[in-house]
Protein backbone atom coordinates (compact mmCIF):
# COMPACT_ATOMS: atom_id res chain seq x y z
CA UNK A 1 0.00 0.00 0.00
CA UNK A 2 1.47 3.33 -1.03
CA UNK A 3 1.21 6.49 1.03
CA UNK A 4 0.43 9.80 -0.58
CA UNK A 5 3.02 12.56 -0.40
CA UNK A 6 0.51 14.68 1.50
CA UNK A 7 0.11 12.10 4.29
CA UNK A 8 3.86 11.56 4.57
CA UNK A 9 4.49 15.31 4.70
CA UNK A 10 1.88 15.70 7.40
CA UNK A 11 3.45 13.24 9.79
CA UNK A 12 7.09 14.13 9.10
CA UNK A 13 6.48 17.43 10.85
CA UNK A 14 5.73 15.67 14.14
CA UNK A 15 4.31 17.31 17.23
CA UNK A 16 5.21 20.83 16.04
CA UNK A 17 2.68 20.41 13.24
CA UNK A 18 0.13 19.04 15.69
CA UNK A 19 0.45 22.12 17.88
CA UNK A 20 0.16 24.46 14.89
CA UNK A 21 -2.94 22.63 13.67
CA UNK A 22 -4.65 22.77 17.06
CA UNK A 23 -3.61 26.39 17.46
CA UNK A 24 -5.30 27.33 14.18
CA UNK A 25 -8.50 25.52 15.10
CA UNK A 26 -8.67 27.22 18.51
CA UNK A 27 -7.60 30.63 17.25
CA UNK A 28 -4.27 30.69 19.10
CA UNK A 29 -1.02 31.73 17.54
CA UNK A 30 1.59 28.97 17.24
CA UNK A 31 3.93 31.17 19.27
CA UNK A 32 1.58 31.35 22.24
CA UNK A 33 0.59 27.68 22.33
CA UNK A 34 3.96 26.08 21.67
CA UNK A 35 6.20 28.51 23.54
CA UNK A 36 4.21 30.11 26.35
CA UNK A 37 1.99 27.18 27.32
CA UNK A 38 4.58 24.43 26.96
CA UNK A 39 7.50 26.36 28.45
CA UNK A 40 5.44 27.50 31.43
CA UNK A 41 4.22 23.96 32.02
CA UNK A 42 7.75 22.57 31.67
CA UNK A 43 9.11 25.11 34.15
CA UNK A 44 6.41 24.40 36.73
CA UNK A 45 6.79 20.66 36.27
CA UNK A 46 10.52 21.02 36.93
CA UNK A 47 9.76 23.08 40.03
CA UNK A 48 7.41 20.36 41.28
CA UNK A 49 10.09 17.69 40.85
CA UNK A 50 12.53 19.81 42.86
CA UNK A 51 9.96 20.28 45.64
CA UNK A 52 9.18 16.57 45.54
CA UNK A 53 12.84 15.64 45.90
CA UNK A 54 13.37 18.00 48.85
CA UNK A 55 10.17 17.03 50.65
CA UNK A 56 10.96 13.34 50.36
CA UNK A 57 13.92 14.09 52.60
CA UNK A 58 12.03 16.44 54.95
CA UNK A 59 8.30 15.66 55.19
CA UNK A 60 7.87 18.02 58.16
CA UNK A 61 8.52 21.08 55.97
CA UNK A 62 5.40 20.52 53.89
CA UNK A 63 3.30 19.32 56.85
CA UNK A 64 3.96 22.50 58.83
CA UNK A 65 3.52 24.95 55.94
CA UNK A 66 -0.04 24.93 54.58
CA UNK A 67 0.74 27.52 51.89
CA UNK A 68 3.62 25.40 50.64
CA UNK A 69 1.41 22.31 50.65
CA UNK A 70 -1.22 24.10 48.55
CA UNK A 71 1.40 25.28 46.08
CA UNK A 72 2.85 21.81 45.71
CA UNK A 73 -0.66 20.41 45.13
CA UNK A 74 -1.18 22.95 42.32
CA UNK A 75 2.24 22.16 40.86
CA UNK A 76 1.48 18.44 41.01
CA UNK A 77 -1.61 18.93 38.84
CA UNK A 78 0.45 20.87 36.29
CA UNK A 79 3.18 18.22 36.39
CA UNK A 80 0.72 15.37 35.81
CA UNK A 81 -0.97 17.14 32.88
CA UNK A 82 2.38 18.11 31.36
CA UNK A 83 3.70 14.55 31.75
CA UNK A 84 0.71 13.19 29.81
CA UNK A 85 1.20 15.77 27.06
CA UNK A 86 4.94 15.09 26.94
CA UNK A 87 4.36 11.34 26.72
CA UNK A 88 2.01 11.75 23.76
CA UNK A 89 4.47 14.13 22.08
CA UNK A 90 7.36 11.70 22.50
CA UNK A 91 5.31 8.80 21.16
CA UNK A 92 4.49 10.79 18.04
CA UNK A 93 8.12 11.84 17.66
CA UNK A 94 9.34 8.22 17.93
CA UNK A 95 6.74 6.98 15.46
CA UNK A 96 7.59 9.80 13.08
CA UNK A 97 11.23 8.78 13.16
CA UNK A 98 10.32 5.15 12.57
CA UNK A 99 8.06 6.09 9.64
CA UNK A 100 10.82 8.19 8.06
CA UNK A 101 13.42 5.43 8.31
CA UNK A 102 11.20 2.48 7.38
CA UNK A 103 11.13 1.36 3.75
CA UNK A 104 8.28 -1.15 4.03
CA UNK A 105 5.01 0.49 2.96
CA UNK A 106 2.83 -1.56 5.31
CA UNK A 107 4.98 -0.74 8.33
CA UNK A 108 4.87 2.91 7.32
CA UNK A 109 1.09 2.78 7.19
CA UNK A 110 0.93 1.13 10.62
CA UNK A 111 3.08 3.94 12.01
CA UNK A 112 0.88 6.57 10.38
CA UNK A 113 -2.26 4.91 11.77
CA UNK A 114 -0.83 4.87 15.28
CA UNK A 115 0.33 8.47 14.97
CA UNK A 116 -3.18 9.44 13.94
CA UNK A 117 -4.70 7.68 16.97
CA UNK A 118 -2.30 9.36 19.38
CA UNK A 119 -2.72 12.72 17.63
CA UNK A 120 -6.45 12.64 18.34
CA UNK A 121 -5.60 12.74 22.05
CA UNK A 122 -3.49 15.89 21.76
CA UNK A 123 -6.33 18.50 21.82
CA UNK A 124 -7.74 17.08 25.09
CA UNK A 125 -4.23 16.94 26.53
CA UNK A 126 -3.62 20.62 25.69
CA UNK A 127 -7.01 21.56 27.13
CA UNK A 128 -6.21 19.73 30.38
CA UNK A 129 -2.84 21.47 30.52
CA UNK A 130 -4.47 24.88 30.05
CA UNK A 131 -7.00 24.18 32.77
CA UNK A 132 -4.30 23.30 35.29
CA UNK A 133 -2.49 26.55 34.51
CA UNK A 134 -5.66 28.65 34.31
CA UNK A 135 -8.38 27.03 36.42
CA UNK A 136 -11.70 28.75 35.82
CA UNK A 137 -13.24 30.66 38.70
CA UNK A 138 -16.51 29.30 40.06
CA UNK A 139 -18.22 32.51 38.94
CA UNK A 140 -17.67 31.61 35.26
CA UNK A 141 -20.52 29.10 35.47
CA UNK A 142 -22.97 31.58 37.00
CA UNK A 143 -25.75 33.50 35.24
CA UNK A 144 -24.88 37.04 34.17
CA UNK A 145 -26.38 40.32 35.32
CA UNK A 146 -25.83 43.11 32.80
CA UNK A 147 -26.24 46.87 33.29
CA UNK A 148 -26.28 49.17 30.25
CA UNK A 149 -26.41 52.97 30.35
CA UNK A 150 -25.89 55.67 27.71
CA UNK A 151 -22.76 57.77 28.09
CA UNK A 152 -21.54 60.68 25.94
CA UNK A 153 -23.83 61.66 23.08
CA UNK A 154 -27.29 62.51 24.41
CA UNK A 155 -30.20 60.98 22.51
CA UNK A 156 -27.96 59.10 20.09
CA UNK A 157 -26.21 57.43 23.04
CA UNK A 158 -29.58 56.42 24.51
CA UNK A 159 -30.62 54.88 21.16
CA UNK A 160 -27.33 53.00 20.90
CA UNK A 161 -27.67 51.70 24.46
CA UNK A 162 -31.05 50.25 23.54
CA UNK A 163 -29.54 48.59 20.46
CA UNK A 164 -26.94 46.92 22.66
CA UNK A 165 -29.68 45.61 24.94
CA UNK A 166 -31.48 44.12 21.94
CA UNK A 167 -28.22 42.57 20.69
CA UNK A 168 -27.59 40.80 24.00
CA UNK A 169 -31.20 39.61 24.22
CA UNK A 170 -30.88 38.15 20.71
CA UNK A 171 -27.59 36.50 21.67
CA UNK A 172 -29.20 34.93 24.75
CA UNK A 173 -31.95 33.55 22.53
CA UNK A 174 -29.34 32.22 20.08
CA UNK A 175 -27.56 30.40 22.93
CA UNK A 176 -30.81 29.06 24.36
CA UNK A 177 -30.51 31.11 27.56
CA UNK A 178 -33.32 32.79 29.47
CA UNK A 179 -33.12 36.58 29.43
CA UNK A 180 -35.36 38.94 31.42
CA UNK A 181 -35.40 42.56 32.51
CA UNK A 182 -34.86 43.48 36.13
CA UNK A 183 -35.24 47.18 35.45
CA UNK A 184 -35.64 49.29 32.32
CA UNK A 185 -36.00 53.07 31.97
CA UNK A 186 -37.15 53.93 28.46
CA UNK A 187 -37.10 57.32 26.72
CA UNK A 188 -40.67 58.23 25.86
CA UNK A 189 -41.39 58.33 22.13
CA UNK A 190 -38.04 56.79 21.13
CA UNK A 191 -36.48 53.33 20.95
CA UNK A 192 -33.98 54.45 23.55
CA UNK A 193 -33.14 53.90 27.21
CA UNK A 194 -31.56 55.78 30.09
CA UNK A 195 -30.81 52.50 31.89
CA UNK A 196 -31.41 48.77 31.56
CA UNK A 197 -30.57 46.01 34.01
CA UNK A 198 -31.28 42.44 32.96
CA UNK A 199 -30.28 38.89 33.80
CA UNK A 200 -29.15 36.16 31.44
CA UNK A 201 -29.64 32.73 32.98
CA UNK A 202 -27.79 29.86 31.37
CA UNK A 203 -24.84 27.60 32.09
CA UNK A 204 -21.67 29.66 31.76
CA UNK A 205 -23.46 32.88 30.76
CA UNK A 206 -21.17 35.03 32.90
CA UNK A 207 -18.05 33.28 31.61
CA UNK A 208 -19.18 33.89 28.03
CA UNK A 209 -20.07 37.55 28.52
CA UNK A 210 -17.79 38.90 31.23
CA UNK A 211 -15.37 40.41 28.69
CA UNK A 212 -18.19 42.56 27.27
CA UNK A 213 -17.85 44.90 30.23
CA UNK A 214 -16.50 48.27 29.11
CA UNK A 215 -17.28 51.37 27.05
CA UNK A 216 -18.83 50.67 23.64
CA UNK A 217 -18.54 53.49 21.09
CA UNK A 218 -20.79 54.13 18.10
CA UNK A 219 -19.94 56.28 15.06
CA UNK A 220 -22.70 57.09 12.57
CA UNK A 221 -24.76 59.85 11.01
CA UNK A 222 -27.97 60.31 13.03
CA UNK A 223 -31.29 60.56 11.20
CA UNK A 224 -31.67 64.12 12.52
CA UNK A 225 -28.28 65.24 11.18
CA UNK A 226 -28.89 67.67 8.29
CA UNK A 227 -25.26 68.16 7.22
CA UNK A 228 -24.28 64.49 7.03
CA UNK A 229 -21.73 64.68 9.85
CA UNK A 230 -20.69 61.55 11.71
CA UNK A 231 -21.45 61.69 15.44
CA UNK A 232 -19.64 59.71 18.13
CA UNK A 233 -21.54 58.43 21.16
CA UNK A 234 -20.90 55.87 23.88
CA UNK A 235 -22.69 53.43 26.15
CA UNK A 236 -21.32 51.61 29.18
CA UNK A 237 -21.81 47.88 29.70
CA UNK A 238 -21.21 46.29 33.09
CA UNK A 239 -21.29 42.49 33.35
CA UNK A 240 -21.58 40.93 36.81
CA UNK A 241 -21.88 37.36 38.08
CA UNK A 242 -25.48 36.96 39.22
CA UNK A 243 -25.73 35.87 42.85
CA UNK A 244 -29.16 34.81 44.07
CA UNK A 245 -30.69 36.22 47.24
CA UNK A 246 -30.42 32.76 48.81
CA UNK A 247 -26.63 32.86 48.39
CA UNK A 248 -26.10 36.38 49.75
CA UNK A 249 -25.34 35.48 53.38
CA UNK A 250 -21.61 35.23 52.66
CA UNK A 251 -21.51 38.69 51.08
CA UNK A 252 -22.83 40.86 53.92
CA UNK A 253 -24.74 40.92 57.18
CA UNK A 254 -28.35 42.06 56.95
CA UNK A 255 -27.61 44.82 59.46
CA UNK A 256 -25.20 46.37 56.92
CA UNK A 257 -27.99 47.18 54.45
CA UNK A 258 -30.19 50.24 54.89
CA UNK A 259 -33.63 49.83 53.28
CA UNK A 260 -35.69 52.87 52.29
CA UNK A 261 -39.12 52.92 50.64
CA UNK A 262 -40.55 55.88 48.77
CA UNK A 263 -43.06 56.87 46.15
CA UNK A 264 -42.24 56.02 42.58
CA UNK A 265 -41.11 59.04 40.55
CA UNK A 266 -41.81 57.63 37.10
CA UNK A 267 -44.79 58.20 34.84
CA UNK A 268 -47.86 56.17 35.68
CA UNK A 269 -50.73 58.29 36.88
CA UNK A 270 -52.19 58.57 40.38
CA UNK A 271 -50.78 55.19 41.47
CA UNK A 272 -47.31 56.74 41.44
CA UNK A 273 -48.30 59.38 43.97
CA UNK A 274 -50.27 57.17 46.37
CA UNK A 275 -48.13 54.05 46.80
CA UNK A 276 -44.65 53.81 48.31
CA UNK A 277 -43.49 51.02 46.02
CA UNK A 278 -39.99 52.26 45.15
CA UNK A 279 -37.08 50.80 47.13
CA UNK A 280 -33.55 52.05 47.73
CA UNK A 281 -30.87 49.86 49.30
CA UNK A 282 -27.60 51.19 50.69
CA UNK A 283 -24.76 48.88 51.66
CA UNK A 284 -23.30 50.96 54.47
CA UNK A 285 -19.69 49.62 54.50
CA UNK A 286 -19.13 50.25 50.77
CA UNK A 287 -21.66 53.00 50.06
CA UNK A 288 -23.11 51.03 47.13
CA UNK A 289 -26.72 52.04 46.48
CA UNK A 290 -29.39 50.37 44.37
CA UNK A 291 -32.73 51.98 43.55
CA UNK A 292 -35.61 50.02 42.05
CA UNK A 293 -39.07 51.23 41.04
CA UNK A 294 -39.74 49.08 37.99
CA UNK A 295 -42.66 47.20 39.56
CA UNK A 296 -45.81 48.41 41.31
CA UNK A 297 -45.05 45.90 44.04
CA UNK A 298 -42.71 47.01 46.81
CA UNK A 299 -41.88 43.36 47.52
CA UNK A 300 -40.84 42.73 43.90
CA UNK A 301 -38.79 45.92 43.78
CA UNK A 302 -37.00 44.93 47.00
CA UNK A 303 -36.26 41.46 45.63
CA UNK A 304 -34.86 42.88 42.39
CA UNK A 305 -32.81 45.49 44.26
CA UNK A 306 -31.21 42.83 46.45
CA UNK A 307 -30.38 40.75 43.36
CA UNK A 308 -28.50 43.71 41.86
CA UNK A 309 -26.81 44.53 45.17
CA UNK A 310 -25.66 40.92 45.59
CA UNK A 311 -24.11 40.88 42.12
CA UNK A 312 -22.35 44.22 42.61
CA UNK A 313 -20.89 43.14 45.94
CA UNK A 314 -19.80 39.77 44.52
CA UNK A 315 -18.02 41.58 41.68
CA UNK A 316 -16.43 44.00 44.15
CA UNK A 317 -15.12 41.14 46.28
CA UNK A 318 -13.74 39.37 43.21
CA UNK A 319 -12.06 42.60 42.08
CA UNK A 320 -10.37 42.98 45.46
CA UNK A 321 -9.06 39.42 45.29
CA UNK A 322 -7.66 40.02 41.78
CA UNK A 323 -6.62 43.65 42.09
CA UNK A 324 -3.30 43.29 40.29
CA UNK A 325 -4.84 41.58 37.26
CA UNK A 326 -7.77 43.99 37.23
CA UNK A 327 -5.48 47.00 37.13
CA UNK A 328 -3.37 45.46 34.35
CA UNK A 329 -6.29 44.83 32.05
CA UNK A 330 -8.79 47.53 33.15
CA UNK A 331 -11.61 45.50 31.68
CA UNK A 332 -14.44 47.04 33.69
CA UNK A 333 -16.05 50.44 33.25
CA UNK A 334 -14.81 53.41 35.25
CA UNK A 335 -16.63 56.05 33.18
CA UNK A 336 -18.18 56.47 29.77
CA UNK A 337 -15.50 58.76 28.38
CA UNK A 338 -14.72 58.27 24.69
CA UNK A 339 -11.02 57.65 25.38
CA UNK A 340 -11.76 54.40 27.27
CA UNK A 341 -13.45 52.67 24.34
CA UNK A 342 -13.47 48.89 24.33
CA UNK A 343 -15.18 48.45 20.98
CA UNK A 344 -16.25 50.74 18.12
CA UNK A 345 -19.36 50.23 15.99
CA UNK A 346 -18.93 52.29 12.80
CA UNK A 347 -22.21 52.15 10.89
CA UNK A 348 -21.03 54.28 7.96
CA UNK A 349 -18.19 51.82 7.29
CA UNK A 350 -20.29 48.76 8.24
CA UNK A 351 -17.47 47.81 10.63
CA UNK A 352 -17.09 46.70 14.25
CA UNK A 353 -13.64 46.77 15.86
CA UNK A 354 -12.55 45.43 19.23
CA UNK A 355 -9.62 47.58 20.32
CA UNK A 356 -8.16 45.09 22.81
CA UNK A 357 -7.07 42.68 20.10
CA UNK A 358 -7.39 44.82 16.97
CA UNK A 359 -10.08 42.52 15.58
CA UNK A 360 -12.43 43.99 12.94
CA UNK A 361 -15.47 42.60 11.16
CA UNK A 362 -17.00 44.30 8.12
CA UNK A 363 -20.56 43.11 8.53
CA UNK A 364 -21.94 45.21 11.36
CA UNK A 365 -25.60 44.53 10.62
CA UNK A 366 -25.06 40.77 10.96
CA UNK A 367 -22.96 41.29 14.09
CA UNK A 368 -25.75 43.30 15.75
CA UNK A 369 -28.15 40.40 15.24
CA UNK A 370 -26.35 38.66 18.10
CA UNK A 371 -26.11 35.26 16.49
CA UNK A 372 -23.36 33.13 14.93
CA UNK A 373 -21.02 35.94 13.81
CA UNK A 374 -21.34 37.64 17.18
CA UNK A 375 -20.63 34.35 18.95
CA UNK A 376 -17.50 33.75 16.83
CA UNK A 377 -16.30 37.29 17.57
CA UNK A 378 -16.69 36.77 21.31
CA UNK A 379 -14.90 33.42 21.13
CA UNK A 380 -11.83 35.08 19.58
CA UNK A 381 -11.80 37.63 22.41
CA UNK A 382 -12.04 34.88 25.03
CA UNK A 383 -9.12 33.06 23.37
CA UNK A 384 -7.08 36.27 23.37
CA UNK A 385 -7.87 36.74 27.05
CA UNK A 386 -6.65 33.24 27.87
CA UNK A 387 -3.44 33.94 25.96
CA UNK A 388 -2.88 37.07 28.05
CA UNK A 389 -3.56 35.16 31.25
CA UNK A 390 -1.09 32.47 30.19
CA UNK A 391 1.56 35.12 29.61
CA UNK A 392 1.07 36.69 33.05
CA UNK A 393 -0.23 33.84 35.20
CA UNK A 394 1.55 32.68 38.32
CA UNK A 395 1.04 29.52 40.37
CA UNK A 396 0.61 30.63 43.99
From Swiss-Prot:
InterPro entries: PCRF, Pep_chain_release_fac_I, Pep_chain_release_fac_I_sf, Prokaryotic/Mito_RF. Disulfide bonds: none annotated. Its main location: mitochondrion. One of its GO terms (cellular component) is mitochondrial matrix. Transmembrane segments: none annotated. Pfam families: PCRF, RF-1. It is found in: Mitochondrion. One of its GO terms (molecular function) is translation release factor activity. Keywords: Methylation, Mitochondrion, Protein biosynthesis, Transit peptide. Methylation of glutamine in the GGQ triplet is conserved from bacteria to mammals. The modification N5-methylglutamine is found at residue 270. Gene3D superfamilies: 3.30.160.20, 3.30.70.1660, 6.10.140.1950. PANTHER family: LD18447P. Belongs to the prokaryotic/mitochondrial release factor family. This is Putative peptide chain release factor 1, mitochondrial. It comes from Schizosaccharomyces pombe (strain 972 / ATCC 24843).
